[in-house]
Amino acid sequence: MGAGGFRKNTGRNNTTLPYNVGFLNNVQDTETYNVAVYDELQKVSTATNQMFQAIDEIHEEIDVRIKALNAMNLQFDELENRITTEIETAIADIQTQMGNLSTEDIWDNSVQPPVKLESTVSGFKTSIEGNTTKIQTVEGIVNDQGQEIALVQTELQNINGSLSQYMKLSEYEATWGVNSTVNGRYAGVKLTNNGTNSQFQVTANKFIVGDGSSGNTPFVFEGGRARMEFADIKNVNITTAQIANARIQWAQIDNVSISNAQIQNLSADKITAGSMWGSNWRLTVGGDFVMGGTGGAQLWMNGNRIDFYDGSGALRIRIGSW
């Protein structure tokens, strides 16, 4: 707060937070990578120092305003004491003057009070009204100062409570992160690199990767599930999958277990299978093929012969060797 009552301009008005981290591209060796990481962390350090400097300036501004408010409170107390003294003195003077007046001076056969007493009372009234105006003026200034201080304190609490940006750089590990807590909800990002392993962590209820040109969101992670509109994967290893509708142009599968299959066209060099059944046919593991006919008749075929049985189970025709 300046001398004219204007709000102090601090560095926090020019600070942009949080710091946007760039990606490290085209890094060929460990030395180049470490230099690139160090440069990024220096940028983070600069942004962090700007934020902490802005917070320090807010603390200084609060201290200045509190001192100004204390000084005004002291002036208010001094003014109150002076006004009280003036009122008590004026009352004592009136009492003394009235004690010295005679009956003729007070009434003088007139409805008007005597000039001397009237002048004293009028002066006393003017003094009281002037002091009241001073008190109201001081109270207004004090209230304005209190509102300004409350505003700055709220601003500082929002900065300290909702955003904490930190950076740690040592011989063994470099860490950068931004954490935000609002209404009990926590979100943040964290980047850690110790020269051997690196980690990038995102904590949020919903994580979105969007297309800057089209505005589409091809990747969304929410509620423990990841959703991708389109994926071009060169190699993938899936332990368990649930696919509602899939189209595969070409697949090489070493082992597969299918409960139910609908195949329009099938071409295979070799198929190894156990027994298979249909509504009126059966193919056994031993190589027998049985086909049912009308009235319970059956046709049996294997590598040696062909047998035909009628509805009663009697052999009617046998072709081959036996």
Curated annotation (Swiss-Prot):
GO annotations of cellular component type: virus tail, fiber
| Keyword Acyltransferase attached | no
Record's keyword terms, sorted? Late protein, Viral tail fiber protein, Viral tail protein, Virion
InterPro entries in the record: GpJ_CSF (IPR015406)
Q: What's one Pfam family here?
A: Phage_Tail_Tip
The highest taxon in the source lineage is Viruses
Subcellular location per UniProt equals: Virion
Has keyword Amino-acid biosynthesis? no
Role summary: Putative tail tip fiber protein.
Q: What is this protein called?
A: Putative tail tip fiber protein
Phylogenetic placement of the source organism: Viruses, Duplodnaviria, Heunggongvirae, Uroviricota, Caudoviricetes
